[in-house]
Amino acid sequence: MKQATVKHPHPGRGGARPLLAALALACLLAPQAAAQRKFSRDYPAQSNIRLQLLNRSGRIEVVAWDKSTIRVTAVMESRSAKMEPEATADGVRIDVRRDNREDVGDINFTIRVPYDSTVDISTMSGGIVIRNVRGEMVRAHVTSEGDIELTGIRARTVMAENTVGNILFDAELLRGGTYVLNSTQGDIQLRITAESGFRLMAVAPRTRNIDLNGFAQMGEFEFFNEKRKVVGKVGDGGASLSTTNGRGSIVFMPR
């Protein structure tokens, strides 16, 4: 009787499939990685230095550190992107819109600044994160869509504005300070030190969603226009706080 022949799969074929998949993925990612360009440079900084950045699109993170140096690191999506920071005795200015007449894709920034810096950041789209800055002013402006996150802030003037996106504001309010936070569509969350004294005007015309939480027992407030607007004072009212949200919530949290 003739014995049946059993066919075995090719001994190397099973192990080759994961290798081929990995090679295919590498081929797909290689052009993207090759197209990117990285910029990194340090600039000596004096006290009360100013950082100004005007970007088109991309994520921007600014973090304060204990060094007399501004460190700018940027990853550019396109190798044709240009960036020529201007360094003066007053600070560093980066204008991506001026240096690139056409859209060159995302440029993502990570920047380190001294604690006492003034920070002025503007982008057409993309998120902005600013942490632990204690200078005279902090400004974050997103023309279209992008979240804004300001944490550990201790500045006399703070302005944050976007069209679509959330705003997180975690700060100590200073006597005589001015704080303005506005969004058209998104949620605004304010975590403020409980010892801060401030005058408040909060407006949510579409949602009427304004939640004072613990501050409701710490100050005096009046509601207007069917709770679309809240005006009041906490403590000595030493700072001015104004926030408007067209189509989202405004939530206050003492910390």
What are the functions of these language-model segments?
Residues 1-255:
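Intrinsically disordered, low-complexity terminal regions
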